[in-house]
Amino acid sequence: EMLKRLVALVLVVFSLSLQGCVSGVGGLKSYADSTDGYRFLYPNGWSEVKVANGPDVVFHDIIKPTENVSVVINPTQGQKTLADLGTPSEVGYKLGKSAIAPPDSGRTAELISAEARELGDQTYYLLEYLVKLPENQERHNIASAIVYRGKLYTFNASTSEARWGKMKDLLTTAAKSFSIDG
């Protein structure tokens, strides 16, 4: 199942991070992938991490490497739109159970919010999670997802719950900046 392939991405996202290209807006830099046709903003001072298998790209904070953003691309099973996969809450719940906190991972994911947003003529789902890890650790994830040309593109930003207050605006802006050139 396409969502299961996100498991590898999220596992990497919990432990990795990213870097930048062009100067951007308010503490953010711009990254564009001309091959896969997506772009997003990420925090200044983050660097790209090369990862085999899983995410298409990962950036993380050099000082706090568990703070990261990543993009995962998975084929869909014939679904042409996000609505074909379900409502924002349904897709958020599925991603939470299959990718962010899969069975036997020791993690649980609580979907805090799920909304659809339009960017140009495309629909994206913005999903926010509180993730509980073993030993009372908590993380906060915000994701943006779109189905485009038979593939599910998922942008995910993650930080510790303790740093969420400080990182919320930057990571939310990064997630909302994720777009497909279509």
Where in this protein do the model-derived segments appear?
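Bacterial N-terminal signal peptides that target proteins for export
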Residues: E1-V10
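C-terminal motif of bacterial Sec signal peptides marking the signal peptidase cleavage site
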Residues: S17-G20
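Bacterial signal peptide processing site
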Residues: V22-V25
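Short acidic-hydrophobic surface loop/beta-edge motif
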Residues: K29-S34, E115-E118
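Proline-anchored loop/turn motifs at beta-strand termini and strand-loop-strand connectors
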Residues: T35-G54
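Soluble non-cytosolic domains of exported or imported proteins
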Residues: G37, L85-E90, E161, G165-D169
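Surface-exposed amphipathic alpha-helical segments
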Residues: W46, G150-G182
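Conserved polar/disulfide-associated segments of primarily extracytoplasmic proteins
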Residues: V49-Y153
